[in-house]
């Protein structure tokens, strides 16, 4: 689902 970036992105995207 969060293939756009790393874990940092997951925090930003919620």
From Swiss-Prot:
It comes from the Bacteria. On the 2D-gel the determined pI of this unknown protein is: 5.8, its MW is: 44.7 kDa. This is Unknown protein CP 37 from 2D-PAGE. It comes from Clostridium pasteurianum. The lineage of its organism: Bacteria, Bacillati, Bacillota, Clostridia, Eubacteriales.
């Amino acid at each position: 689902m969060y293939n756009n970036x790393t874990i940092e992105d997951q925090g930003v995207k919620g």
